[in-house]
Amino acid sequence: GFAVEVVHRPGNGDWTSAVQEAIARPGAPVSLASISSVHWADGGAIDIASIAPALRAKGAALLVDATHGAGVTPIDVKTLDPDFLIFPTYKWVLGPYGRAFMYIAKRRQEGVPLEQTGFGRRAIASEAAPYLKDTNFAPTARRFDMGERDHFISLEMAAVGMEMLAEWGAGAISARLGVLTDRLAEGLASESL
C-alpha cells in the first residue's frame, strides 16, 4: 500500500522549506514526490534544485509538474536530474489543449506505462504484416506515448509555440513578467485590498 501526504500552504509562504521539512520527517520513506515548480494556487516558486538532492538521498523518485513554470522559468533536466518532468502546452508554452510533454530519465524508461497503446510497443503497425509482430514495450520513453499521439494539427500548434518561446528565451519572459508583477504590486500597495 501507499499513503499520499499533502504539504499544506505554509504560513510564511516558503513552499521550499515546507517540502524539505516533509521529506526530512521521520516515518515511512518517501517513494515518489510529485512537486510543482510553481504552486498553482499562489504562484509561489518552489526551489526544485534544492529539494532534488534530499529526495535522491532518501532513494525517492522526483516527478516535476512544470505546468506553471515551463516556458517562463528555465528548466535544465541535465542539472536538475528529475525522474519525470511533465507539462501541458496550453499554459505558458502557447500550445493547444490536449497536448503535453513528458521527460523520463533513462533510469525510469523500463517502467510499465499506464496507457497500453500500440504506439508504445516495439512493432505493432497496421501497414505491416503480421500486425502484432512484437508486442513488447518499446525500449525507450516512447513506451509512454499516449494513444492518438499523431494529431497533426495540435502537434504543429505546439511546435510553433515552443519555437516562439525558444526565440524569446525563458529568462527574458521571466524578467518581463517580473517587471509587470512589480508594477501591479506597486499600484495595489496604495489600495485598501
What are the roles of these predicted feature ranges?
Residues 1-193:
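Pyridoxal 5′-phosphate
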